[in-house]
Every structure is written in structure tokens, then in C-alpha cells.
């Protein structure tokens, strides 16, 4: 990279951090860190009616949770602030006045009703993409002064140059061209005095010395408008990279109303997903490393990130893959951290009290350890461990079939006799008791283990049996064995 790399992620506080925004932030971050550059988080809060309370804090908090430790923002001044657009209105005003003075922009007094009428007339004439006619472009200074004196509200529009081709040399899509004739004179300042996105973003990116802009492909159509502003001021635009859409499993564009996918980072956090797994997963949404490996640490991703490997085709948000990936991380997780992740869900579900005794806390820790291999996310411990919290065992159909086999009464009777004598009631002692049953009954393998598992858990698959039996407790195991011996299957 010839110049200093400075990138930006510019969320609006109109909601919480969405998976699309998280992916954009992540690619900006990986690129900046790969080249030893800086990442700016700028808050684009000019759509005041749509801003939600706590939206700003939520965006920043979730970025930090993911491991995106940006360099500059509203909470980290890097000398390029303010980092909130509503605090930059005077800056925009200065540049708007410059364009007005140079004749590159003009005041437009057309009412919303007039503009709608224009659009309808153009549609009726078969024009698919209506544009502003530009009639206020030709007002004389006297006419403008008179309309202003009458207190008529106005917007400010940019004069679109005629007969120009705008070319974007995009890092993802290659060369993309736009014709100025397809773009009508567009509004740079709304009637309320607030600049529009396509104007403010150019001023900000230039003054903050942004070198590269990674953003979603829905912004591609904004690029020619932004290039016009760069051109009028004689500024060099940044290098653009428009990332492909994220689609759902039906290959449809992800919409915030799509209920088949959890869409906000905070929801994954609440469910007990790990930030390092989410970071890894988002990095593979529209970018692929060389080779087959899919599990990478943050530092590895920073080292191998290569813009040339950004995908040109839509990337599918595969929830099964995310769950699989999170499970890979959980398997390797330090038990203390896993307990921190999963235990609150058992409390929230009412399975355990909030103020646990040391004994209860140790039992919960052992329970969570028992399911470490199977658990895909923290909250899943509640459904996985259900059998430990039921008074009565519930038999699955497969368990009933196992318990109907002819050798079962012998196996269960022998095991029950051993369990009654067991002291201490530990996994090692339980393992020895199962071995003793093997000896006395001659049954082994599935014929031995399956009936015991089915009788005490109601299931045919599950965590390591001696440990599960230990955690169920001696009394509960005796009751369940007795019931299985008396019940008809």
C-alpha cells in the first residue's frame, strides 16, 4: 500500500449491530490491521427521526465484543473528529456554500407535491427511472432572493455535469461505469438544513483522510453521486470495495424481516455464542482463504486477509455452519469460561437458583463439563440437560424399543443391586459396577449399556454414561431403575 491505510465503518444509530454491518466492520478492520492502518467508527446520525435510544452505545459495545478494537470514534479521539455527523453540521455548511458560490449547486423551491407530479408525468410517458427536471436550476439570483424573502422552504441540489462517464475501479467488481445522464440533479441538503448521506459522506471521508471504503454492494449506485462531489472539490476519492450481498439459505437477499435467521449480534451474544467464533464466521462471509481450513484465530485472519480473495457472488448465511463453528470453539474452551457462558442460562430457565451453594455450583460445573462436546451455544445447555431436572423420566421411542429387549430385566436387576451397594457414588465406582454387571450377566456392548442408559435417562444417546449417572444422584437412579423394571414396554 502506497499511502497510509485509513478505513471507516459508519453505522447509523437507527438500530443495533446487524450481521451485515458486522461483516462490513470486520472486513474494514481486517484490511486496516493487515496493512498496519487505522480504523475509524463514524456515527451517521443525521436521520434524527429514525435514531433509536441506545443505538450508538449498542453498535460500539457489540463491535468491541466481537473483537473489533477500532482506533478512532466518539469514545476514542484520534484528531479527526467530531465523529458524530450531527456535530459536523457547520463543517458541511462551509462546503455547501462553496458549491453554491461556484455555481455547482442551487436552491430548489419545488414542493414535494410538485416533485411527485413530475415523477408521475414521467412515468406516464414511459420513463422507468424518473429524474428531477432541473427547473430551479435556471432561476435568476433575483427570483431566488424573492422566493427566500417569501419564506419559501428549499432544498439544495447538486448540478449533475452533462455527458460525463464516471468510472469506479472497484477492488471487488473491477471497472464499473455510470453515465451522468442517468442521474438527475440530486439533493445535497434537505429542507431542514441537514445534508444528505451522499454529500456528508464525501466531506467526512476526505477530511478524515479515508483511503479505502469497504461497504455493501447496495452502495454501489451511490458512488457516481459521491464522485461528482469529489470532482467539484478537486479531491482524490478513496479506493472502493463493494462487498456482495448476504443471502439466506433460499439464496434470497437477507431482509431484516426474515425470521429464519437471527440477525443481530446482540442476540447471538445473549444466546451464548462466542465472539471469537462469530469473528471467524463473519470473516468467511464473502471472503475465502487459500486451502480447506476454516477455523482461524483473529491474528491469523489479519495476517492472511487478501482483498483479491473477496467473492464476487453472494455469500450465504449458513446457520448450521455457524452452529458447527461455535461448537468447535466450545470444545476447546477453558471450563471456567464455558461455565460463565452456560450457567446463567440454567438460572434464567429456573433450573438452578441464582444464589447457589458451593455444592450446587460444583454440580452445575460438572453438568456443563458433561455437555462440553455437544454444546453448540451457551443457551443450549437448557435443552441438552433437561433429563437432569425432570422428576419422572420420559422415554423416547427408541428407548422404549431398547427396554423391550429380552435381556433387559437381567441387566437392570443386576445393575440396581450394584447401585444400592455403591459408596462413594462416583463415576469410577459406577464404571466398575457396569463391568460387574457384564461379568454376571454375560451381556456386553450395546446390549449392556443401552438398557442402562435408556432406563436412567429415557434416551439412547447422550453424554458419558458413568458421569451422567453420578450427576443424577443415587436416589434418582434407583427410582428410575425400579420404574423401568416394573413398566411394560
Curated annotation (Swiss-Prot):
One of its GO terms (molecular function) is glutamate-tRNA ligase activity. Zn(2+) binds at residues 108, 110, 136, 138. GO terms for cellular component: cytosol. InterPro entries: aa-tRNA-synth_I_cd-bd (IPR045462), aa-tRNA-synth_I_codon-bd_sub2 (IPR020751), aa-tRNA-synth_I_CS (IPR001412), aa_tRNA-synth_I_cd-bd_sf (IPR008925), Glu-tRNA-ligase_bac/mito (IPR004527), Glu/Gln-tRNA-synth (IPR000924), Glu/Gln-tRNA-synth_Ib_cat-dom (IPR020058), GluQ/Sye (IPR049940). It is found in: Cytoplasm. Its cofactor is Zn(2+). GO terms for biological process: glutamyl-tRNA aminoacylation. Pfam families: Anticodon_2 (PF19269), tRNA-synt_1c (PF00749). Catalyzes the attachment of glutamate to tRNA(Glu) in a two-step reaction: glutamate is first activated by ATP to form Glu-AMP and then transferred to the acceptor end of tRNA(Glu). Monomer. PANTHER family: GLUTAMATE--TRNA LIGASE, GLUTAMATE--TRNA LIGASE, MITOCHONDRIAL-RELATED. Belongs to the class-I aminoacyl-tRNA synthetase family. Glutamate--tRNA ligase type 1 subfamily. This is Glutamate--tRNA ligase. It comes from Geobacillus thermodenitrificans (strain NG80-2).
